[in-house]
């Protein structure tokens, strides 16, 4: 599968590296294809780098891994993505009164906002619930950690669930894209524990089921 990863910073490079290892063709979509660290990333993973609209055009799946502050302009500049599967890994974070908070909350979500920017695409919210370090660390756990996903198109969710599983996670369907309203605040639990409560970044969420 050709996967276009829009953004090649921590999240984008982690996801692209993981799926390259799983055998997918990775195309990083960036503003500057000549950056030294990007060239090193492509050499390490076998990926290629193109201007973001060109990468998105070529991808069977398009992954959005951008800072929320620049997301709207960058996504709208991608061009016609009609029918494409879009993975939204972004959390709508912003600084408010000196603290990191969600810009959107329980009455709307970043996932729904992305879907409104791309009304003819099939948007699936996932990979927003842990830090970049854990996104390709699923196979390091004795029991696969959980990664929820939300979207309105069941066929798209099936494809995305397979991609989630390939990175070592137990993919669980949270429902329609409206459920991004709970997945994005859920991500704040990881951020709070990892960055402010001393747990560190080397952990993920799991689902425990009773024996028998």
Report residues per predicted region.
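NAD(P)+-binding Rossmann beta1-loop-alpha1 motif at the extreme N-terminus of oxidoreductases
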Residues: 1-45
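Rossmann-fold NAD(P)-dependent oxidoreductase module
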Residues: 14, 18, 117, 163
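Rossmann-fold NAD(P)-binding glycine/threonine-rich loop
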Residues: 90-133, 137-139
């Amino acid at each position: 599968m050709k996967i276009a990863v829009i953004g090649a910073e921590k999240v984008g490079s982690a996801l692209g590296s993981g799926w390259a290892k799983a055998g997918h063709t990775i195309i990083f979509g960036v503003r500057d294809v000549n950056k030294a660290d990007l060239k090193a990333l492509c050499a390490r993973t076998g990926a290629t780098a193109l201007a973001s609209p060109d990468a998105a055009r070529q991808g069977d799946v398009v992954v959005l891994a951008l800072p929320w502050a620049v997301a709207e302009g960058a996504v709208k500049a991608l061009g016609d993505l009609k029918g494409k599967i879009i993975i939204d890994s972004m959390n709508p974070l912003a600084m408010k009164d000196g603290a990191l908070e969600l810009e959107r909350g329980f009455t709307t979500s970043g996932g729904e906002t992305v879907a409104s920017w791309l009304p003819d695409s099939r948007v699936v919210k996932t990979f927003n619930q842990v830090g970049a370090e854990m996104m390709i660390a699923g196979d390091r756990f004795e029991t696969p950690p959980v990664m929820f996903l939300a979207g309105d198109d069941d066929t798209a969710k099936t494809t995305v669930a397979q991609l989630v599983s390939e990175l070592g996670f137990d993919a669980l369907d949270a429902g329609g894209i409206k459920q991004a309203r709970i997945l994005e605040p859920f991500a704040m639990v990881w951020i709070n524990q990892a960055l402010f409560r001393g747990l560190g970044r080397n952990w993920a969420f799991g689902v425990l089921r009773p024996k028998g």
